Curated annotation (Swiss-Prot):
The RNAP catalytic core consists of 2 alpha, 1 beta, 1 beta' and 1 omega subunit. When a sigma factor is associated with the core the holoenzyme is formed, which can initiate transcription. Transmembrane segments: none annotated. HAMAP family: RNApol_bact_RpoB (MF_01321). Residues 581-603, 1172-1197 are annotated as: Disordered. The keyword Nucleotidyltransferase applies. InterPro entries: DNA-dir_RNA_pol_bsu_ext_1_sf, DNA-dir_RNA_pol_bsu_external_1, DNA-dir_RNA_pol_su2, DNA-dir_RNAP_su2_dom, DNA-dir_RNAP_su2_hyb_sf, RNA_pol_bsu_bac, RNA_pol_bsu_CS, RNA_pol_bsu_protrusion. This is DNA-directed RNA polymerase subunit beta. One of its GO terms (molecular function) is DNA binding. Its EC number is 2.7.7.6. Belongs to the RNA polymerase beta chain family. The lineage of its organism: Bacteria, Bacillati, Bacillota, Bacilli, Lactobacillales. Residues 581-597 have a biased composition (Polar residues). The gene is rpoB. It comes from Oenococcus oeni (strain ATCC BAA-331 / PSU-1).
Length: 1197
């Protein structure tokens, strides 16, 4: 096949091996977030206020209505919000109108509704100065669902559930005896007839008239549902029975029963299907979707009485086309069911019916009852829906209709930011509504204004809580641009109203055929969240109902040619069509080359004649998400390893001088640009000025546009976010062109790693078990060097004893420790600091209050005031040393917003330059990960015949069992490309074939097996076998040894157990667990074990004594009782068990609380002794009292 060159942008051209024609641009990748938020701002807010308002008081005198809303200008810009650690938000003002119905007076007023968080251009929010993302949630769609099960006897039983957005669930099923039952809101079962009767159809004959008289499960229910109380009507009795189930034990009347049932289902405030639920219910129950494939038991006539489709016709697509327009007519086959006035709703119930033959018994005539023409604006359920739903349920027993697959994407929908926000806001408004009603009745109706009625606290609190602590509002993953982009496209089945990890079974997590082109089957976390957290496919988009759609090219039904007309289909619509693969061979005119093609229909992959094809995929990468689409030769990798590859690309650390992959897939440019980290030209123009901080562009209309660049900014993950210009002065630029690369980018393309020369061979056992051997050159030339920035904060607060002070005057600190602090005690920018160095000098008062007798005594003894401040300076934590990159100072005088009680805050940023070292984790794009085990001098590395040493050695054992062959193909093609000096684009499922790789190797003058003779760098001799050598894109991951290495000698202890804390963050110890104890027991190392379990852990008295005896050079004393043992005794005593501890002689051991201060004389005792033995405290020259050198003996105390 012929390759062709593709110009990615002005700087990069790649040789493409793709054969499929690109008919559709990849849509904007952050659209999931931005479109949803825009909808919320344009329509969602209005909808919500209109739902809640008008609010009327209990007497109906006052009415508060919503008029309009407006958003003001944000108080802080995006940059300022980050620096000041505040929300990027704008004030929301709502215009409300208050009408006094008695006087006719109208007051309009603008009411402030708090600050509303704004979304940034690329789909994130800035909350408290940190970027956050609201992840879209994948939930079960409201609607009506039918399921099929087999009971113990092997009989097939059907069930129905009506699931609303909010409100009571309604379930239908048949029991072991075949009786049709109903349940409301998970209460006890009732015969199905009770609900039908409650609608106002009391007699058995009325029920059979509606549904037909040959339905076994209904007839059994009628038999079971006997008339118990002849003094009551059947309707009244049914209403009371239902009331009894819903409110057991409460006194019941017909009226209260009727209003309860009406409120449960037919009150829009209590029951809400949402526009999605209404759409799903109408779609499921309308006759249009149910007639296909059935046989008519009556003639279908048009309005003129002509037969359009005769009786006994089996309805196919053609006859459906004839019937379809008739079904849309208001009065076509409509039955008006007139209920008794005792029923819940007295209005006539309109349903649409057609008679057909049963599929089980072709002679039996059954009814299809549709729910009529219910408007989409009606969001609660109606009796017509329930009757049509019951009819569908009965028809299933006749083989008519289909059950639903709950994991099908036609039944699961996405709640994006806009909807999640709307739901939260609505909760706030509902709480506010209660307050407004109460205030309306309390306040004077003549003088009251909208402002006095409204309390915005509940609304503000709810929004704040959502962004701050909801499970779906997450701290943005800012390791690299791909991680950011991916986080915004993530779909989660967890969260409020979703699943929980423990309850989610295998089916929910599994890949479903309806995921094709909608949800990536590969990218998902390993571990407990597998399958629950997924990613939106590249071309997927979310429609107005929240269902994921994917685009297809339409195939003309007459000519069978593929057109460029694109249709977006949801999963349930797609099930009706046959869809050909994107790489089906086509002629230039769009006709298929072969008479048959491989296609999909529902969950079947079929070889089908081209006449049956309805659509064709738009692109081979339609199936996958962005990070999976960045893996070249994905089709040659095992899916488990591809999963790791997709996940690890998000963890690649931005390097100092990254390089885009030599073998790419073509998505690198779009991923980088859409991540929002590159600087993009907003208009066409000419570059006039460039330096590291700004780019100035003269636009065509003569204005000078200045683009500030991001410099050494700390990202959420502590990585260095930096932008580098890639344009020159005088260069002409187009709108949308990349002016400056962001982190992990090169020439506008994603560049997560480097392209080293890699060989698959062993080296003295150093690459055993996925270990990696590195050439020292990679360290020396900063190939894998990255910059990391950590932020440290110190606040000077007001304490009870006086204000804290940031100062250079710190007690007991030598001048050498203060050398880099300025006059105010803050470190200078550019200073090099190590662990434990002072960053901000701070002192806290110990209290200069009225002195107590004891303190006066001590002052008398020591002769001077004890220093009243202690050193609380901010110091560099362990492993945190580096260069001071920036210092930010916030004070009230400068007008900065500080928390209450804080007078000054200092933020210090420390930058570390980390070269690659032993223990760092590295990985390719195919899940081929490993840790660096040794860094070898360049001269000792194996070298090629031209003398060039290999950069990285990987173990050949890592390939066969893992089945990620993509890395080998990438290796060979990369080698050829490097020799030819070109870059390559090989898209997923449409890349270079084996033959094309061999051709490229030949073109580059290399052997076609891609192997080379290598020479041992230590001896200079050739190795026995030729070795695979090539170029592969290899990344350094965020799991660096510097962040993980940790050691402790003395550190903090847990308060209750007195054992050392655990973990690096707490500066904890290493846990010596149960199994480790066994190991020492096995060797009989009794003393080692004893000191580990006592002195080194929680024997409080023992560890203090050990310290003392080491200092004094005495023998180490015997250990005491571990604190955890004392805790156990106390816990048993708390259970009321009298527990005593006896020693070997049978005497009780006193378990008194042994504090560290047990043997330190108290101040009271000192005063006492001073009175009794004043000579003890006399110094050499009588006027300087001193404390004796030895501790006071016990009896003195």
């Amino acid at each position: 096949m012929v390759t062709h060159n593709v110009k990615i942008n002005k700087h990069v051209t790649r040789r493409s091996y793709s054969s499929a024609k690109e008919v559709l641009e990849i849509p904007p990748l952050t659209e999931v977030q931005t479109a949803s938020y825009k909808w919320f701002m344009d329509k969602g807010i209005k909808e919500m206020f209109n739902d809640i308002m008008p609010i009327e008081d209990f007497a109906g005198k006052l009415s508060l209505e919503y008029v309009d809303y407006s958003l003001g200008e944000p108080k802080y810009s995006l940059k300022e919000s980050r620096e000041q650690a505040v929300n990027y938000a704008a004030p929301l003002h709502v215009t409300l109108r208050l009408t006094n119905k008695e006087t006719g007076e109208i007051k309009s007023q603008d009411v402030y509704f708090g600050e509303f968080p704004l979304m940034t251009e690329y789909g994130s929010f800035v909350i408290n100065g940190a970027e956050r993302v609201v992840v879209s949630q994948l939930v079960r769609s409201p609607g009506i669902y039918y399921n099929e099960d087999t009971d113990k006897t092997g009989r097939v039983v059907y069930g129905t559930t009506v699931i609303p957005n909010r409100g009571a669930w309604l379930e239908l099923d048949t029991d072991a005896k075949g009786v049709a039952n109903i349940r409301i809101d998970r209460t006890r079962k009732l015969p199905i007839t009770e609900l039908i009767r409650s609608f106002g159809f009391g007699s058995d004959s009325e029920i059979q008239d509606i549904f037909g008289d040959e339905i076994d499960s209904l007839n059994l229910a009628i038999e079971k549902d006997v008339h118990k109380d002849p003094s009551m009507s059947r309707v009244g009795e049914a209403l009371e029975d239902i009331y009894e189930r819903l409110r057991p034990g409460e006194p019941k009347t017909i009226d209260s029963s009727r209003s309860l049932l009406a409120a449960r289902f037919f009150d829009p405030k209590r029951y809400d299907l949402g526009n999605v639920g209404r759409y799903k219910v109408n779609k499921k129950l309308s006759l249009k979707s149910r007639l296909l494939g059935q046989t008519l038991a009556e003639d279908i006539l048009n309005s003129d009485g002509e037969v359009v489709v005769p009786k006994d016709t089996k309805i196919d697509k053609k006859s459906m086309k004839l019937i379809s327009p008739l079904l849309d007519e208001e009065d076509f086959h409509v039955e008006n069911l007139q209920p008794d006035e005792e029923g819940v709703l007295p209005d006539p119930i309109k349903v649409q019916t057609i008679k057909i033959f049963s599929q089980v018994d072709p002679t039996k005539v059954i009814k299809l009852i549709g729910n009529g023409h219910i408007d989409e604006s009606i969001h609660h359920i109606l009796p017509a829906d329930i009757i049509a739903g019951m009819n569908y349920f009965f028809n299933l027993q006749e083989g008519v209709g289909a059950t639903d697959d709950i994991d099908h994407l036609g039944n699961r929908r996405i709640r994006s930011v806009g909807e999640l926000l709307e739901n939260q806001f609505r909760i706030g408004l509902t709480r506010m509504e209660r307050v407004v009603r109460e205030r309306m009745s309390i306040q004077d109706s003549d003088t009251v204004t909208p402002q006095q009625l409204i309390n915005i606290r509940p609304v503000v609190a709810v929004v704040k809580e959502f962004f701050g602590s909801s499970q779906l509002s997450q701290f943005m993953d800012q390791t690299n641009p791909l991680g950011e982009l991916n986080h915004k496209r993530r779909l989660s089945a967890l969260g409020p109203g979703g699943l929980t990890r423990d309850r989610a079974g295998y089916e929910v997590r599994d890949v479903h055929y309806s995921h094709y082109g909608r949800i990536d089957p590969i990218e998902t976390p390993e571990g407990p969240n597998i399958g629950l957290i997924t990613s939106l496919a590249v071309y997927g988009r979310i429609n107005e109902y929240g269902f994921i759609e994917t685009p297809y090219r339409r195939v003309d039904w007459d000519t069978h040619k593929v057109t460029d007309k694109i249709d977006y289909l949801t999963a349930d619509v797609e099930d009706n069509y046959t869809i050909a693969q994107a790489n089906s061979p086509l002629n230039d005119d769009g006709s298929f080359t072969n008479p048959t093609v491989t296609a999909r229909h529902g969950d079947n992959n079929i070889e089908t004649p081209i006449e049956d094809v309805d659509y064709m995929d738009v692109s081979p990468k339609q199936v996958v998400a962005v990070s999976t689409a960045a893996i070249p030769f994905l089709e040659n990798d095992d899916s488990n390893r591809a999963l790791m590859g997709a996940n690890m690309q998000r963890q690649a650390v931005p390097l100092v001088a990254p390089h885009s992959p030599i073998v790419g897939t073509g998505i690198e440019y779009r991923a980088a640009v859409d991540s929002g980290l590159a600087q993009i030209a907003e208009e066409k123009g000419t570059v006039e000025y460039v330096d590291g901080r700004t780019i100035k562009v003269r636009e065509e209309d003569g204005t000078l546009h200045e683009y500030p660049l991001m410099k050494f900014q700390r990202s959420n993950g502590g990585k260095n976010y930096n932008q580098t210009p890639i344009v020159k002065v005088g260069e002409k630029i187009e709108k949308g062109e990349v002016l400056a690369d962001g982190p992990a980018m090169e020439n506008g393309e994603l560049a997560l790693g480097q392209n080293p020369v890699i060989a698959f061979m062993t080296w003295h056992g150093y690459n055993f078990e996925d270990a990696i051997v590195l050439n020292e050159r990679l360290v020396r030339d900063d190939v894998y060097t990255s910059i990391h920035i950590e932020e440290h904060e110190s606040e000077a607060r007001d304490t009870k004893l006086g204000p804290e002070e940031i100062t250079r005057e710190i007690p007991n600190v030598g001048e050498d420790q203060l050398k880099d602090l300025d006059d105010s005690g803050i470190i200078r920018i550019g200073a090099e600091v190590e662990d434990g160095d002072i960053l901000v000098g701070k002192i806290t008062p110990k209290g200069v209050t009225e002195l107590s007798a004891e303190e006066r005594l001590l002052h008398a003894i020591f002769g001077e005031k004890a220093r009243e401040v202690r050193d609380t300076s901010l110091r560099v934590p362990h492993g945190g040393g580096g260069i001071i990159q920036d210092v930010e100072i916030f004070t009230r005088e400068n007008g900065d917003e500080l928390a209450p009680g804080v007078n000054m805050m200092v933020r210090v940023f420390i930058a570390q330059k980390r070269k690659i070292q032993v223990g760092d984790k590295m990985a390719g794009r195919h899940g081929n990960k490993g840790t660096v085990s040794v860094v070898v001098p360049e001269e000792d590395m194996p070298f090629m015949p031209d003398g060039r040493p290999i950069d990285i050695l990987l173990s050949p054992m890592g390939v066969p069992s893992r089945m990620n062959i993509g890395q080998i193909l990438e290796l060979h093609l990369g080698m050829a490309a490097k020799k030819l000096g070109i870059k390559i684009m090989t898209p997923v499922f449409d890349g270079a074939s084996d033959d094309e790789i061999i051709d490229a190797l030949k073109e580059a003058g290399l052997d076609e097996d891609g192997k080379t003779v290598l020479y041992d760098g230590q001896t200079g001799e050739a190795f026995d076998n030729r070795i695979s050598v090539g170029v592969m894109h290899y990344m350094k991951l965020a799991h660096m040894v510097d962040d993980k290495i940790h050691a402790r000698s003395i550190g903090p202890y847990s308060l209750v157990t007195q054992q050392p804390l655990g973990g690096k963050a707490q500066f904890g110890g290493q846990r010596f667990g149960e199994m480790e104890v066994w190991a020492l027991e096995a060797y009989g190392a009794a003393y080692t074990l004893q000191e580990i379990l006592t002195y080194k852990s929680d024997d409080v008295r023992g560890r203090n004594k050990v310290f003392e005896s080491i200092v004094k050079g005495q023998a180490i004393p015997k250990p005491g009782v571990p604190e955890s043992f004392r805790v156990l005794v106390k816990e048993l005593q708390a259970l009321g068990l009298d527990m005593k501890v006896l020693n070997g002689k049978g005497q009780e051991v006193k378990m008194a609380q042994m504090d560290e201060d047990d043997n330190v004389a108290t101040v009271d005792a000192l005063e006492q002794i001073a009175k009794e033995k004043p000579d003890l405290f006399k110094g050499d020259d009588d006027d300087t009292p001193r404390i004796p050198a030895t501790k006071l003996d016990e009896e003195n105390v």
